[in-house]
Amino acid sequence: MGKIHILKNADEKTLKKVVSDIKIDSETVDKIINNNTRIEFNENDDYIFIIFYLPEYVKATKTIDSLEVNILYHLKTNDAFIFTNNSYYFFDKYKSKIDEIDHKGFGSFIERFISVVIDDESKMVEHILSDTNEIRKNYFVGVDNYKLIKDLTSSQINISTLTLITSNQNKLLNLIESYTTTKQQTTLNYKKTYLTEELQYAKEFCTTVMKSIDTKYQVKSAEDLHRFTKFSFVVFIATYFVGLITLLYTDNSRGNIFFFGAIATSVLSLLGVLIFFRSKN
């Protein structure tokens, strides 16, 4: 039975010391040390090398980031070396669980390791659904639309990020299929299908809540526009009568009776306009 070694932020010197018994080429060393952009699966007589990506939730920003993981599996000793840089929590949280993986070959190791990853992804979906449900509750109690839309947009972005990462993982599952038994394949396919369905449900749930908020926002905007139109009309009438008053006062210097009459007329007119619009509400 092989051992599992987790190495975080390993430099080239440490890397070469750790894998001194493995005939590892310089190109693979460079890939482990540097950042890569896509999933990769390579095999030779000595080892299997995998570039793999998993999601990590960043509490500070409430976002999901993609974490690159490099796996070097020694075929002669069945030792697995897991290299990762800048991990927020995954390998600290699941170290004991990964250390306990009982494997006699690459197939059993990779099936159990990916199962740990998928289980963590399922927990992320549960958190997203919980957050979205909280947003839904806040929507019904009248929380500010801007905050609701901001929080909901964050959930939608996290769902999209998680969907993209898991889609890439599915490519790896296809590549390792020939190394796993039928039972191991069934286990991974079940977990993968369940996660895909949960992600789809979370996406639809977020979309439904967003549409409800948008509808409410559009209705409120229409009401605000209606109020603004009424207010503008009242201001227009008031401005008109003020201009009329000024004209009368200027032209009628012989007395103030016309001036006060104009004031009374404008006030009554404004009251009439206000009463009219109030009766229309």
Task: Put a short name on every predicted segment.
Residues 143-248:
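Membrane-associated alpha-helical segments
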Residues 121, 195, 214, 269-277:
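Alpha-helical transmembrane segments
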Residues 41-43, 88, 221, 250, ...:
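A generic membrane alpha-helix/interface feature
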Residues 231-281:
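Alpha-helical transmembrane anchor segments
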